[in-house]
From Swiss-Prot:
<feature type="binding site">
    <location>
        <position position="192"/>
    </location>
    <ligand>
        <name>substrate</name>
    </ligand>
</feature>
<feature type="binding site">
    <location>
        <position position="262"/>
    </location>
    <ligand>
        <name>substrate</name>
    </ligand>
</feature>
<feature type="binding site">
    <location>
        <position position="161"/>
    </location>
    <ligand>
        <name>substrate</name>
    </ligand>
</feature>
<dbReference type="GO" id="GO:0006543">
    <property type="term" value="P:glutamine catabolic process"/>
</dbReference>
<dbReference type="InterPro" id="IPR015868">
    <property type="entry name" value="Glutaminase"/>
</dbReference>
<dbReference type="InterPro" id="IPR012338">
    <property type="entry name" value="Beta-lactam/transpept-like"/>
</dbReference>
<protein>
    <recommendedName>
        <fullName>Glutaminase</fullName>
        <ecNumber>3.5.1.2</ecNumber>
    </recommendedName>
</protein>
<feature type="binding site">
    <location>
        <position position="168"/>
    </location>
    <ligand>
        <name>substrate</name>
    </ligand>
</feature>
<dbReference type="Pfam" id="PF04960">
    <property type="entry name" value="Glutaminase"/>
</dbReference>
<comment type="similarity">
    <text>Belongs to the glutaminase family.</text>
</comment>
<dbReference type="GO" id="GO:0006537">
    <property type="term" value="P:glutamate biosynthetic process"/>
</dbReference>
<feature type="binding site">
    <location>
        <position position="244"/>
    </location>
    <ligand>
        <name>substrate</name>
    </ligand>
</feature>
<dbReference type="GO" id="GO:0004359">
    <property type="term" value="F:glutaminase activity"/>
</dbReference>
<feature type="binding site">
    <location>
        <position position="66"/>
    </location>
    <ligand>
        <name>substrate</name>
    </ligand>
</feature>
<comment type="subunit">
    <text>Homotetramer.</text>
</comment>
<feature type="binding site">
    <location>
        <position position="117"/>
    </location>
    <ligand>
        <name>substrate</name>
    </ligand>
</feature>
<keyword id="KW-0378">Hydrolase</keyword>
Length: 308
């Protein structure tokens, strides 16, 4: 019989995984992230019934980085017809590093999916075309979904990323050369880096992403965020592309739709049941949280949960 969730079980899982701390590496290509202590470990679970469970550093905020790509995609889904989005970005795994230009050149400026950097930049370009204040709108979205009114961007992280943005700028200009990028590159990059610099805790992330476990409905402000079909589509993209080139290994070990960020966070969804957020800043070779993935693996084994 599968275990019942409680805080004691989560504490036990973190204790089992804690020996992994020190075996990964904190992201150092963004100086503002390199200063984060690697000795952090956290988990929070929010269920569709409204229960919240947590352990470790679950209320400490960190830079969510690429987890924000799910939120920007959801924002675009609310502004554009389906065909308008998917004619500019694909739905397939890339099998390449998240900041690769090679595949983008070969495939004439159309990114494989919205969760690699190129795809997320196209989505941000689309938001720039439709929203008068894209950064403020994103803050409004996460504040509504989380029920937390003081969520904000980490200006130091956003500035640090912009100062080291040569590769992302190259990606944007390459797509512009193929006609798949319409706005000012620097403006869109600033929006993109601010989204990545959102500071949230595991508790806030689990609450924010609960709508993906509940057919697109957010209980925190009692309305649909996306349609049930759109929620299913986002979960499918997370399952195939949310963990970069490690998606297959993650599906094997954990078996849930998930999205990671180089800040060490991972959000995972058990459809119809719960949203899970874990955090540990040290990364593996593919840019995913080393201990965070291990926590999710042990959790799904304990609970007997998988979408496969």
């Amino acid at each position: 019989m599968a275990a019942v969730i409680d805080n004691e079980m989560l504490d036990d899982i973190l204790a089992q995984v804690r020996p992994l701390l020190g075996q990964g590496k904190v992201a150092d290509y963004i100086p503002a992230l390199a200063s984060v202590s690697g000795n952090k470990l956290a988990i929070a679970i929010c269920t569709v019934e409204g229960q919240l469970y947590q352990a470790g550093d679950a209320t400490e905020r960190f830079s969510i980085q690429s987890i924000s790509k799910v939120l920007s995609l959801v924002a675009a889904m609310r502004q554009y017809e389906e065909d308008e989005i998917w004619q500019r970005v694909g739905k397939d795994p890339s099998g390449q590093p998240f900041n690769s230009l090679l595949q983008l050149e070969i495939e004439q400026g159309k990114p494989r999916n919205p969760f690699i950097n190129a795809g997320a930049l196209v989505v941000c370009d689309m938001l720039q075309s439709r929203l008068s204040a894209p950064r403020q709108r994103m803050l409004e979205i996460v504040r509504q979904l989380s029920g937390v009114s003081d969520l904000s961007y980490d200006a130091n992280v956003a500035r640090s990323e912009f100062e080291h943005s040569a590769r992302n700028a190259a990606i944007a200009w390459l797509m512009k050369s193929f006609g798949n990028f319409h706005n000012d590159v620097a403006t869109v990059l600033q929006n993109y880096f601010h989204y990545c610099a959102l500071k949230m805790s595991c508790v806030e992330l689990a609450r924010t992403f609960l709508f993906l476990a509940d057919k697109g409905y957010s209980s925190h402000h009692a309305q649909a965020v996306v349609t049930p079909m759109q929620a299913r589509q986002v979960n499918a993209l997370m399952a195939t592309s949310g963990m970069y080139q490690n998606a297959g290994e993650f599906a094997w070990r954990v078996g849930l739709p998930a999205k990671s960020g180089v800040g060490g966070g991972v959000v995972a969804i058990v459809p119809h049941e719960m949203a899970i957020a874990v955090w540990s800043p040290e990364l593996d070779d593919t840019g995913n949280s080393l201990a965070g993935v291990a926590v999710l693996e042990k959790l799904t084994q304990r609970l007997g949960r998988s979408v496969y």
